């Protein structure tokens, strides 16, 4: 995205404050539905930062995968489960709070050290790519063809496994003598449920 330097700097600051504010809302709000919506806001703000970095494909993938899939999945899970439980006191809670604070402080110190010691100068000699989608597509189908195909096979296996798990409740109970005869057949919906749905 070709913007003036001042506009790009201000846009980055606005998006960074949106990311930090929405992330704090995710972890501090008691209503989990509001937290899920703010998580979608975090993902949208991160995609805006990707657009400022001229990574249009990564920004589109961020919106499609995280906002369109993960946030909607979390909202559906919250609304379908809808189970309210009262908070109960956990023994040794102060020890957990202290250990959590120490871990968070260590991670913050590590990230701050990395930010301070990393050289952030931009190399101007590199070629500027106008359309990153074409370049990523060429790399997918030339240099990274095998990992791309393996990822598609893994996604297909996950989809088949999800379908089998979803249909497991509809498989009828089989007796011991019929198990050996129908071991290699695909599970089908019981006739009672099929006729009832019609």
From Swiss-Prot:
Subcellular location: Membrane
Entry keyword set: Membrane, NAD, NADP, Plastoquinone, Quinone, Translocase, Transmembrane, Transmembrane helix
Principal place of residence: membrane
Molecular functions per Gene Ontology: NADH dehydrogenase (ubiquinone) activity; quinone binding
E.C. code: 7.1.1.-
Pfam families linked: Oxidored_q3 (PF00499)
GO cellular component labels: membrane
Catalysis performed (reactions): a plastoquinone + NADH + (n+1) H(+)(in) = a plastoquinol + NAD(+) + n H(+)(out); a plastoquinone + NADPH + (n+1) H(+)(in) = a plastoquinol + NADP(+) + n H(+)(out)
Residues annotated as signal peptide: none
Family statement drawn from the similarity comment of this UniProt entry: Belongs to the complex I subunit 6 family.
Function in brief: NDH-1 shuttles electrons from NAD(P)H, via FMN and iron-sulfur (Fe-S) centers, to quinones in the respiratory chain. The immediate electron acceptor for the enzyme in this species is believed to be plastoquinone. Couples the redox reaction to proton translocation (for every two electrons transferred, four hydrogen ions are translocated across the cytoplasmic membrane), and thus conserves the redox energy in a proton gradient.
Designated name of the protein: NAD(P)H-quinone oxidoreductase chain 6
Organism: Synechocystis sp. (strain ATCC 27184 / PCC 6803 / Kazusa)
């Amino acid at each position: 995205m070709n913007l003036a330097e001042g506009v790009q700097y201000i846009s980055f600051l606005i998006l960074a404050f949106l990311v930090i504010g929405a992330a704090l809302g995710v972890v501090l709000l008691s209503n989990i539905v509001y937290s899920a919506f703010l998580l979608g806001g975090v993902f949208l703000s991160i995609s805006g930062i990707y657009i400022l970095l001229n990574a249009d494909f990564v920004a589109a993938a961020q919106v499609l995968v995280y906002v369109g899939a993960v946030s909607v999945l979390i909202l559906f899970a919250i609304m379908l489960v809808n189970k309210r439980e009262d908070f109960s006191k956990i023994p040794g809670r102060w020890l957990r709070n202290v250990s959590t604070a120490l871990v968070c402080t260590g991670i913050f110190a590590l990230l701050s050290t990395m930010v301070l010691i990393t050289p952030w100068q931009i190399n101007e000699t590199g070629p500027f790519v106008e359309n990153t989608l074409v370049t990523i597509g060429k790399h997918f189908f030339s240099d990274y063809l095998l990992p791309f195909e393996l990822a598609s096979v893994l996604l297909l296996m996950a989809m088949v496994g999800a379908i089998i798990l979803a249909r497991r409740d509809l498989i009828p109970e089989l007796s011991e003598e019929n198990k050996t005869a129908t071991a290699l057949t695909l599970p089908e919906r019981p006739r009672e449920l099929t006729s009832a749905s019609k």
